[in-house]
Each structure stands twice: as C-alpha cells, then as structure tokens.
Amino acid sequence: MKFLKIAFGLALFGTHVNCMAVPPGAESVPVCKQIGVRKEVRSLTATEWQAYANAVAAAYNDKWIDWFGFYHSVVADTVHGSSQFLVFHRHFINSYEDILQRYNPAVMVPYWNMMIDFQNPANSAVLGSKYLGGNGVGAKGCVSSGVAGAWTLAYPKNHCLGRAYNNGTTISPWYSPEYVTSVLQRSDTYADLRAGIENSVHGAVHLGLNGDMSTMHSPTDPVFFLHHVNIDRLYAQWQAVKPATRTYMYDGVDSKNAPATVNDFITGTSTPVYQVMRLGYGNMCYTYDTIKAANGDASALVKRQPHKCIKRPSPATQQIIKQLPPKVLAQFYPAFANGPGHPLENEMVAISPLQPMAADACAVDFKAPPPNENMRGKMPFPSGLPDDWIKMQGSSVAEVRALEKSAYDMVEALNKANYLSPYMV
C-alpha cells in the first residue's frame, strides 16, 4: 500500500477543527510526515493481501504472535470493561502494525467490517480458505486453512490455533450495520461509545468464533487484529463527526473505578492517553479509507482496476435506513431524525455479504443481488453475552443487559416497520 504525504497541519478528522480543545502536552505531539491508509480487507488487491499475509507469517515464525497473545492476557483485567478499552487497543494494534512493517514497510493492517456479515458470519468470504480460514476441525478444533492454517502456538501452552463456532458449523447472528449506526449516532460521550461497542459487536465476534478468540490470549488468532482495527475505525469515525469536541474526549472510569483522564497512561506503557487520540500525530500515522472518502477523496473506496469487485459508496444503500418511520428514527437514529446525518455515522455501506474479495480478480464487475424479500421484517436478534464472559471482561452484567435490551428493542422496532435490511440475503 502506498503512503500518502501529509502537509503540516492536515486534519485527518475533518475540516472543522479550529476550535479543538487540546489538552496540555498534546500540543507538542508532532504531526506525522507520512500517513498509511487502512482498508477493508475485501478491497485489498491480490498483491496487497499477499504482502500482508507474508508479514503475518514472518511475525508468526519470529514468535511475535505468541508475544502479543501473552501481553494482552497479562494486561487484560485493566483494559476491558473500562475507559482503557478503545485507547489501549488503538495503541496495541499500532504496535502490531509496527512489527509487521519491519518485514514490509508498506503493509497496513486491514479491517474486517463484519457487521455486513451479521446474518450468517460463517459464510463470509473473509473466513474462507484464501484469507483467515474457517472453523476448527478434528478433535482439537484446529484451524487448517487460511493465513493461520496449521499454526502451532506456544502460549499459553503448545497447541494448535483453535476455533469452535458457537453454533456448531455456523455462527449465531452478530450485530448489524443498522445497530452500529445507531450506536454511533446515540453515543454522546466516549464512555457511551466504549460501552456500546465493547459490549455488542466486540464480544459477539470473539464468542462467535470461540476457541482461542474466546480467551484473553485472543491476539494469537489473526482475526483478532482485523476485528479490532474495525472497532478502532468506528472510534475514529465517531471522533471525526465532531472533531473539535470528540478528538480528546475521554470520560468514564478506569479498572479501579477512578475517573479516567487523558493524562492516564496506556496500561503497560509510559504513553499518556492523549498521545494516541489524534490520528496523524505522534505514532498514530494512519487513517481509514472511510475517513478519506468522507473528506472528499472519492477514490478512497473505489478500486482502480478496470473490473471492480467492490463499488462504494452507494447513496442508495445509505438512504434505505432513513425511510424508517419518524418515531423509530427519533429513538434509534437521532442524526437522521434531525437531518441528513454525517456519512461517518452511517454504516450502511454497499458491500454485500455475497461480495467476492477484490483479490479474487473478478472477471466482471460484481453486482450485489437484491435482499431476500422473504426476510422482510425478520431481522434476527443478536446473540447475548453470557455472564461468565461479561465478568471475565470486567464489565457490569446489568450494563450489558441494558445495552442488549436496547439492541433487541431496535430489531423489534425495525421488524414491526417491515424493514428489509440490504444485508439479508
């Protein structure tokens, strides 16, 4: 992937940042000289994907995968169920990306927008043999295909990389783009966003894949990083909607229930929280294809090959959800109820669950099939998080159950409105 040079003072979070409140110390964090772009994994060319896979293989051979699993498990108690969740994992992912760039400086960690696969996650092309591999096989549930096929890990003890889908050969439904759009629009504070994302799509993916992904050494599964890059993308987009107030917004409590501040250190480091909060500064020398597109770079989400597996963005897809009854919009989509909304708080992208990977070199342009009319008014409810997982994460069972009820209420409201999600196939 090519790096883009950045002029001094370029605002990656948008164009209106003149009144940004910068905390003491943050003003001295230097602007990046080069910016990498993290892309959705389905949009990577064959060359880009192979470069990433090669770097991951090299990191595995040098035992870095074991190290990241070990490190995450050591600090897990303080970085989940608290304000550290988003900022710690932003720093953690960046450290992983730094390691991969030792093998290939052009590599950027892609994200997996797994929300579009929510109806039938196991059928996603991303979990296919060419990419991240699928369910575990055999008595030990070993992953045998994909970038991590036949991996043997040393942490916490010698074992194969394992997955055991939570519904046998399939995965129970995850959280939809419609739900994540609602979280982005209804989260007025950092603490709101952290809780809304951590206790929904975050947990659902870990538990859906199960195996090593359901443990605190989950970074040993390569899905972990694509999953958490997607979570970081959502955080970055939420910041970018109102950069003046959200870039350095950091509230809630830490793992000891003390008020969180931007001067807190990222767990396990000497890095203050404020140093990771503004993309394009310090060591956070990256942005996302979605943010570039929202800032006017129309080519950011469109492949340049003559034949395109992916065509984005789609104004038509983004308009579908805005046609819900006013009462539903007011309750779950306040930005749409009050106007057109910001494109970065609308996760209704034009990728289909049946989308081939761009790296598959489509012979012709891909045309997504229409959604299944038989599924109108039948959006599935996402799976709940079990009590033992919630407690392992250090979260409040009552808080999680309240968030789940909100998600179920949204699904029920959309079904009563006879809504047909474009991702129901």
Question: Each predicted region: which residue ranges?
Answer:
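Fungal secretory targeting signals
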Residues: M1-P24
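Intrinsically disordered, flexible peripheral segments
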Residues: N18-S82, V87-V425
